[in-house]
Amino acid sequence: MGAKRERIQPDKLHVRKDGDKVLYSQVMVVEVGGTRQIFVAGQTPRDAHGSCVGMGDMRAQIEQVGRNIKDALEAAGATLADIVKTTTYVTDMDEYFKHQDMRMRFFSDALPTSTTVQVARLSRPEFMVEIEAFAIV
């Protein structure tokens, strides 16, 4: 018997479409062996309408991305405390590290494992940070 999968498109999150067709799932919940594994697609600093929050402001972008991850997890019945792994993509590592305290506001003492990678560009040129999250409940 295969794992049960549930795709979630939270109302609070913007999702890219081609016409009326959604191009990806914001959240995928996979139930395996009595646990719910929650995969949150890379969150960018978009608001629910698709506008970039914090143009040119890494700190504001990190805050918006954190809110988006929180909203995605809540839609799946989880919290930020359930995150076990994040992958962060940034366009300027030095600038990102100046604002680590903003990222830390979203986590309790049980910090998730984390990978941070600098990239040349994200999906839109004004985006400075994108974070994927993996949670287990």
Label the predicted regions.
Residues 1-67, 71-84, 90-137:
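N-terminal presequence-like segments and the immediate start of the first folded domain
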